[in-house]
Amino acid sequence: MILVFLQSCGQDNHIRTYQLAKTKAPVNKPRVETPEKNSTGFSWTKPGSWIASSGSSMRLASFDVPFSGGMGDLSVIQLGGTGGSIEANVNRWRRQLNLDSQSLFEIEKEMIDYKGGLGDYKIIRIINEELDSAFLCAILPAGNQTLFVKLSAGPKGIREIETDFISFCSSLIISI
């Protein structure tokens, strides 16, 4: 650069012009999440706004999940076999929200079926409007084990985050 400057400063009064190659401005590409691989034996694709967090040793993964009214907590745990019955698990979650237990028939009426990378799975919303607390829970059979994904937030947060929650659950696959 200095050499160019010195050569351009001659004694004559001629105007010199130089041409420099244009560099391309970086293109802002949309952020695409790639599947996260880890030592758990499972991979997933999480929404860009979710923040990995520390959880208990029982959790395969933990995320802070922002929504307009605050921050939700998402956990992924793995249990052998079925991890207990659907009725036992859902009623445990209901008790955590100070709600009465339900029969398996009542629970199954509220469950929604989905298909994802691990196959068929179920999601249930458990909401206690009086406490302003809610869970969105998925039960995903995975061979000889079951994954449980639970999002804890307020009822408004559950409704806001539900689409991302379903996408996350559907993205879960077994890593090889």
Please give the residue ranges for each predicted region:
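N-terminal targeting sequences that direct proteins away from the cytosol to non-cytosolic compartments
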Residues: 4-72, 79-118, 127-132, 140-145, ...
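Hydrophobic residues at beta-strand termini and immediately following loops
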Residues: 124
